[in-house]
């Protein structure tokens, strides 16, 4: 894991949902992203702040 990567507070992770599906998110520490498996999107975390904009999310390819 990158030393500069931030950790996500588990309580925050319980509150945040995918803006598209309203489903749960999981934290990917290697990519420092919040992942919506249902929407197949990964939301970046920049300077410790989750960017919960669909337009900023990375599409997850299989």
From Swiss-Prot:
Pfam families: Trm112p
SUPFAM superfamilies reported in the protein's UniProt record: Trm112p-like
Record InterPro entries: Trm112-like
One of the record's GO cellular component terms: cytosol
Domain of life: Bacteria
Family: Belongs to the UPF0434 family.
UniProt name for this protein: UPF0434 protein Smed_3047
Organism: Sinorhizobium medicae (strain WSM419) (Ensifer medicae)
């Amino acid at each position: 894991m990158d030393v500069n990567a931030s950790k996500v507070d588990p309580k925050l992770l319980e509150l945040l949902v995918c803006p598209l599906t309203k489903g749960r998110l999981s934290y990917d520490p290697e990519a420092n992203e919040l992942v919506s498996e249902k929407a197949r999107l990964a939301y970046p975390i920049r300077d410790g702040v989750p960017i919960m904009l669909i337009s900023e999310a990375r599409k997850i390819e299989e």
